[in-house]
Structures are given as C-alpha cells and as structure tokens.
Amino acid sequence: MKKIYQWAVGQSFKKLDPRQQVKNPVMFVVYLGALITTILCFYPMGIPLWFNISITIFLWLTLLFANFAEAVAEGRGKAQADSLKQAKKEVMTYKINSLEDIKEENFIELQSSDLKRNDLVYVRAGEQIPADGDVIEGAASVDESAITGESAPVIRESGGDRSAVTGGTTVVSDYLVIRVTSENGQSFLDKMIAMVEGTQRKKTPNEIGLQIFLITLTIIFLTVSITLVPFTDFSSQLSGKGEALSLVIVIALLICLAPTTIGALISSIGIAGMSRLTKENVIAMSGRAIEAAGDVDVLLLDKTGTITLGNRRASDFLPVHGVSEEQLADAAQLSSLADETAEGRSIVILAKERFNLREREFQQSEVKFIDFSAKTRMSGIDYRGDVIRKGAADTMKKYVQSKGEDYPSECDKIVDKIARAGGTPLVVIKNNRVMGVVYLKDIVKNGVKEKFADMRKMGIKTIMITGDNPLTAAAIAAEAGVDDFLAEATPENKMNLIREYQEKGHLVAMTGDGTNDAPALAQADVAMAMNTGTQAAKEAGNMIDLDSSPTKLLQVVQIGKQLLMTRGALTTFSIANDIAKYFAVIPVLFYSIYPQLDRLNIMGLGSPLTAILSAVIYNAVVIVALIPLALKGVRYQEKPASQILSHNLLIYGLGGIIAPFIFIKIIDLILSLIIL
C-alpha cells in the first residue's frame, strides 16, 4: 500500500496537466481559479499578500487532493494489473496443422505472439498455454492460479462446457490440443489488464448524468460570482460603506460554493467500485455493468451450485410393501458400488451407516457392473444370478412393465411424495421386482434463505432456474425462500422470461457457463459468465467470474448497490456542504456594506478574509477526509431504498450541513489567533 501512495503522490502532480484537468469540468474551474490567483499574487490589487498567497496555495492543494484520490484508486488497479501482467509473457509453443500431426517431427516451434486465430497448438504437462482457446483433443489438469488465485488445478477437456482455456495458465498433467480463439493482444488476459488498469474505462450514464448536474450547479454559481464584483461596487458607492469584493475573494467564494467535493471524488468512486469487484475475482467488461448490478431488481439464479450444493445425497430408503428397509438398502448399495457419482457414493455410505452394510469383495467372474448411459437411463449390477437396477421412476416403470411384471401403485405414491418434498426419487428393482425408492435430496446451502429474505427487503425478486419438474422445483423454491421459479428450463424460455421482465421495466441479472446460456446472457442487463464456461458464454456476458461460483452474483449486486449508495451519499454531503458554506460565509462578506447582515453571522466569524480563507481550507481538507470513504464505499445495508435514502439524508445530508459550521469556525479561530 505504501508503494501505491508513493506512486499516487507523483501522479497527483502529473495530473495537473490541463489536458487531464479539462476532463473534469468542475475541477477545471478550480484549476483556472488557481491559475488566476497565482498571477494575482504578483499584482495584489489592495488585498493583503498573505491572504492572496494562502488562497492560492489551498486552491492548488484542492486540485492535488482530488488528483491524489483518483490516483490512489488507479494505483490499486495498477497493482492488480501488474500481477496479471506477470502471467502474460512470451512463450515458445508447438503449432500443428491437424490432429493427425501429433508427432514431434511435425511440430512447428514458434513464439506465442505469432499465433493466429484458429491455429492448433499442442501443449504438454509443465508448459504454459500460449493463448485463449478451446480444447479439441485431450483432457488435463490446468493450474489457473495466475488468473484466478485458486491454487487447486482444474480439469479442462474437449467437448462439453469445460473446454475453454485461458492464455497464461499452465498444464499440470497430460496434454491438450487447443484451437486458438483470439488474436495477439485481444486475449481474455489482455482485456482483463486493460479493464483493471482503466485504459478502457468510459464514463457510465449515471456518471455523465451526475456530471451534467454538477456542471449546471457550477455554471449557476459562476454566473452569480461574476455579478458580485459590479454588484458590490455599486452597492458600496450607493451606501457609502464598505468596498467592492476583490477578484481573489470572488474566485475563492466560487470554489467554496461549487460542488468540488463530489467533483473531486466522482472518478475515484467509480474506479474503486471496479477495484472492489476485481478483488472478488470478478472482471467487469464495463463500468456500466457494475452500475446496472446496483439497479438490478430481478435475479435469475441456477438451482445447482447457487441455491443447492450441487450434489444430491441419499437421505432415506423407502421400501414398498413386503420389502424391508434393509433389503432395499442392500440392493441399492450393490447397484451403486461402481457408481462414482456423488449420488452413488452417498447411497453406499447411507446403507453402511444405517445397517452396517459393507462394500463387498467380488470375484471378477461373478459380477458385472452396468454403467449408466443416456440411452438406458439406468445403472446397476448382475451379481450371483441377481439382476439389480436403479434409475429414474419413469424409466424403471417402463422397464418393469416391459418384462411383463406389475409396477406397484404404492411406488408411484412414494415417488410423488418425494418429488413434492423437493427430492429426486431413484427406483430400485431386483430381478424385475420393485424394491422401493431411494430419496435423493438436494441440499440447500446454509444461509441462502436469509440472503434471499434480505434481497426481498431491498425490492429484489429472486427466481430459481432449474431443469427439474415443477413439483420438485416448487419444493426446493419453498425451502430456499426464493420468490418464484422456472421449472424444466430451456435456453428459449430463459430468454423469454428475461424479455418479459425487461418489457415491464425491470433490470435482470443472471449467470451462465454453457453455449446454450449465451442467448440469455446476451439479453440480460447483468450477465456473469463463468471462467470455466465456453467461449460463447464469456463473449455474451458483461462480467466474468474467475472463481466460476454462481453464488457470486449476489455479491456483485451488493457491490453495484454499494457503488451507487456511495456516489449518492457523497453527492448529498457535497451539496449540503455548499448550502452550509453559503450561509456561513455570505453574511460576513457583505456586512461591511450592509451592517444589518451582521445578525446572520451566527458563527461570529472574525473577518471577511479569515472567513473566506477558513472556507477554502475546509473545502480542501474535507476532500482528504472523504478519500477513504470514496475508496472503501459506504457501509452496505440490506434495506429498502426508501429506508436507505432516509438514512443517507440524515447522516450525509444533516452531517454535510453541520460539519462546515463546526470546522470553519474552528479554522477561523486558529487563523484569528495567528494573524493577531
């Protein structure tokens, strides 16, 4: 952090370049004012030189403090970008012309920067993946810690939704043949570095709108200030008292009344918001996406991995009439001994825990394991003349009936009961006889129900997306506490649901990782793609989660809302400050011409010169005081918007009015003692 501050100090002076200053119109007015007062130091025009120099110094400090706030925010991003740049380095790689060329004598050795889109490269264990691409052959463990920070390697393989690889990651085992999907300089890592450094950061619509508002206020105060010189000159001549305000005092008054506090911090608030998101290992492709996350009022959440743990577990054995629970458990365990899925392992463990049934040792000749296939939709075992199978209820019903056996209606009732409870029924048969049903339960993650309740308080509607049947979906939705659900979801009805809410004026957020998610991701206002997902999903999203955790969407929404809350709170504080400074300073400046105004000098400020200088000093110092808040953000509160508004008006509105009166008075007392 020390290095960031040192770098930021240097940048504060570099940013005094007028080409940089003109990008922020409010602070550019301060810049012009500082230049004019600097020139006037050589031509005092009846104003004490100490006053002129003091005003000039604190106007320049106001600019430097504003530059420092922005530079610190940029410095954090730069530090993150530097760590990413270490992953992006030139490496030698092996290009091949086709999959048939996977022989060392056919390898073409070249630099990674020379690769073109659609080139095929061969990457072995220990070698760095040279560019973004899709795996078209092979399966390997890949170390993605350079990108995600996660030390555990992940599996990347051809086909499916885990085929995308990122340049800069390292193959740990086996080999991969990769088709390059990006040109040099346009990789995912390049985009990450550009976004984190802020080189591609554009002002968001909200920022532009706020800046227009601040410029309008500044123009109003500028117009008022310009008229003060002739007005006070005329008034002093008419009343025969006092004298016209000097140009230095008018400039100082303008800077005090203009919304310089929020003008100084507006850029750093936006940059810090993106930095907070990056710390959560989420890369936003634009600041607009973060702001949209703050305004989101509909969340589409995948059931698996977001609401539930993702692995269903066996929780009960429910036998049909004439079969004991232990007999069902024995058959279910036998049928699952070769099943390496989480569900299969949980059946073996539950049977062991309930009835002390241990895994058997078999002779190869007496056992035949039947693996699950998409065609048969069942798995099982042939063991010592017994044929044991387990599978989905509808599949097993057809299987039993095809063998000419009766399928008990009792089993249908058990299946229906499990589905209504939100579980998945797995029917077990032995020698064409139905033994009963294994109850596989989706385990809802701890704390999600409370999280969804908080979202509801904030006016955010949560919708669970699942491929389960409506009965199962309804039960899990009730247990998790979501507001609605979409069962038997397809890419088409996901996209239609998003459009339906958008047409009603809602902003919708969702996550996705597969090619089939791409259309819905492209349609959503906030679309967070998983880093483990396909290239199509990443390109359709406007955010990428490097940890590939769908639950992260909730944190993204919180960060977006925190950014908007911070900007709103500091804008409220800044404008309240301006109002307070107006009533604190104006009576003192004019009471020499209009003695009656002395009654409004409720603070008892010493003189016009110390009053205006105190206001200028306060104006500069308050920027420094608010830098930590701008960078960290206001405390996030899971409350309705109306309550948050009331809270911010009380804290930042009332606080913004009281603070100037207190601190300007203290500074004025100190100045009065020094001058005396």
UniProtKB/Swiss-Prot annotation:
It catalyses: K(+)(out) + ATP + H2O = K(+)(in) + ADP + phosphate + H(+). Mg(2+) binds at residues 513, 517. It is found in: Cell membrane. The keyword Magnesium applies. Keywords: ATP-binding, Cell membrane, Ion transport, Magnesium, Membrane, Metal-binding, Nucleotide-binding, Phosphoprotein, Potassium, Potassium transport, Translocase, Transmembrane, Transmembrane helix, Transport. Its EC number is 7.2.2.6. It is an enzyme of class 7 (translocase). One of its GO terms (cellular component) is plasma membrane. One of its GO terms (molecular function) is magnesium ion binding. Pfam families: E1-E2_ATPase (PF00122), Hydrolase (PF00702). It is a multi-pass membrane protein. The active site is at residue 302. InterPro entries: ATPase_P-typ_cyto_dom_N, ATPase_P-typ_P_site, ATPase_P-typ_TM_dom_sf, ATPase_P-typ_transduc_dom_A_sf, HAD-like_sf, HAD_sf, P-type_ATPase_bsu_IA, P_typ_ATPase. The chain crosses the membrane at residues 24-44, 45-65, 212-232, 246-266, 573-593, 611-631, 656-676. ATP binds at residues 339, 343, 372-379, 390. Part of the high-affinity ATP-driven potassium transport (or Kdp) system, which catalyzes the hydrolysis of ATP coupled with the electrogenic transport of potassium into the cytoplasm. This subunit is responsible for energy coupling to the transport system and for the release of the potassium ions to the cytoplasm. The system is composed of three essential subunits: KdpA, KdpB and KdpC. Belongs to the cation transport ATPase (P-type) (TC 3.A.3) family. Type IA subfamily. NCBIfam families: ATPase_P-type (TIGR01494), kdpB (TIGR01497). This is Potassium-transporting ATPase ATP-binding subunit. It comes from Enterococcus faecalis (strain ATCC 700802 / V583).
